[in-house]
A protein has these predicted regions:
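Alpha-helical membrane segments of multi-pass proteins
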Residues: 1-261
Length: 261
């Protein structure tokens, strides 16, 4: 572990979220947050701020674990809190109007935010990039390139999970349940293939990394990403089943014989 890399964009967004949350929070309420929410917030901050040295064999497991947190756990937790409207409430009026203009009907940013396929391709491409042993070693020798890749992975993951969890504001058309299930499931086979390849490897694929460390890292990455993607796919199905269960029972016509009821 080499220290903490607190990126300015994440700090700014966290500050706007805190300001908006305090503005929207009912006055006179008790605690600011319970233990569960505080733990999830700490875990999300840890994923975005933790800096590791990937060239050491002892840090290989922790490095891939951070990749999994950046790609799956942290953005999923981030969007589960529905922060879009809260951040807008925390932003100054001038910045709020500028963001609204960027998300206008003819904005390229709005077009990208409406297409889950482009977000998924960008996310999976950046996620798979350093799993190549040659590229992994090259990134370890070039800290600037490695930092740029980390930022690209984190932002592409945020955009991917924007679609997977349907965290967009009202101007984005609401997808059906089937589309909300397909988006996370489409990434599951690719992620599973990576996890299986690392977990069942018989020889070291990365320089200065023992097979045991490679297998442990692959298993952790496989389980972390697989559970998060499966949860995202089952979430809309569980909500649909819950809505069906809460529907009132159909009233039977009067006058039917008891045997037909």
């Amino acid at each position: 572990v080499t220290g903490w890399a607190l990126a300015l964009p994440w700090l700014a967004l966290a500050g706007l979220y805190a300001r908006g949350w305090l503005r929207l929070r009912p006055r006179g309420r008790g605690r600011l947050a319970d233990g569960r929410r505080a733990a999830l917030a700490l875990l999300t901050a840890l994923a975005y701020a933790w800096a590791l040295q990937p060239t050491r064999a002892s840090a290989f497991f922790l490095h891939l674990l951070r990749h999994g947190m950046l790609a799956f756990l942290a953005p999923a937790l981030l969007w589960s809190a529905r922060p879009f409207a809260i951040v807008l409430w925390g932003a100054p009026p001038a910045l709020r109007r500028a963001w609204a203009a960027r998300l206008g009907p003819t904005s390229p940013a709005r077009g990208l935010a409406r297409h889950p396929l482009a977000a998924g391709v960008a996310f999976l491409s950046l996620y798979l990039l350093p799993l190549d042993p040659g590229l992994y070693a090259w990134l370890g020798q070039h800290p600037a390139a490695q930092q740029a890749w980390h930022h690209g992975l984190s932002w592409s993951a945020v955009l991917f999970w924007w679609h997977a969890l349907h965290a967009a504001p009202r101007w984005k058309p609401r997808p059906g349940t089937l589309q909300r299930v397909i988006v996370p499931l489409a990434a599951l086979p690719v992620h599973t293939g990576v996890g299986v390849a690392l977990t069942f490897a018989q020889s070291p694929a990365y320089p200065d990394v023992p097979v045991a460390a490679q297998v442990t890292a692959g298993y952790a990455l496989w389980v972390l990403g697989g559970l998060t993607l499966t949860w995202a796919a089952l979430r809309p199905l569980a909500r649909l089943i819950g809505l069906e269960a809460r529907k009132p029972a159909l009233a039977l016509p009067r006058g039917l014989p008891e045997a037909e009821r």
